[in-house]
Amino acid sequence: MKRLNDEQRSPREPHESIALNPGDLATFYARVSEMSGRDRTLDLSTIRIGERLLDDPVAAISPGGAAPGELILVCDGTEILRDQEAVKPMVVAALQAAGTDCTVITLAASDGHELHTTPDQIATVREHLRVDVAVVVLGSGTVTDVTKHAVYEFERETGNRLSLTVIQTANSVCAFTSGLAVVTTGGVKRTVPSRLPDRLA
């Protein structure tokens, strides 16, 4: 095997790091696109971070701060507490107080034990989706994968894009910032193309 000496090797370009400011994704996308020579903009346009974020869920859902008229909120039955208050009913109450017509879909495990991203769960969410209805996920990576894939299928079938916001209740799960979903079919997990959220909180 022929080996190249140091003089024959192509010089490596110096790597330039890019700081990611979650509050300014537009600048990050523009810088990455400039460096790579192609558009790298993703559908995820907003990331909101804050200890009291849930005090105003409308701000997380709507960039302009106006409450959507009709909204579907998808969650599971797992109780999440903040300051001894149940988070999911608190968010629903805040959305309703802002004038939003909020339909809550609570996913339940078919075997009574653990929720999985299955075609049946995806279909449960899919049948509630309609044009011009905002969709919000409040929960874990599994609920997020179920919902974003239901939205993905709806958009492919109808050609209509829906607003999708994820309010995460787990610290670090790929589902929140991935354009893929892990779907369990016949007991086998498969990673399939799906959809990024528009906003993450």
Question: Which role fits each region the language model picked out?
Answer:
Residues 74-75, 139, 168:
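Short beta-strand/turn micro-motifs composed of small residues
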Residues 87-92, 143-161:
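Short Gly/Thr/Asp-enriched flexible loops that form oxyanion-binding sites at enzyme active sites
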Residues 131-149:
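Extended, charge-rich low-complexity interaction segments
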Residues 79, 143, 172:
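Surface-exposed, flexible loop/turn segments at secondary-structure boundaries
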Residues 57, 147-148, 179:
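Short hydrophobic alpha-helical segments that form membrane-spanning helices or hydrophobic packing faces
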Residues 2-134:
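ATP/NTP phosphate-donor binding region
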Residues 45, 152-201:
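A glycine/threonine-rich phosphate-anchoring loop and its flanking beta-alpha core
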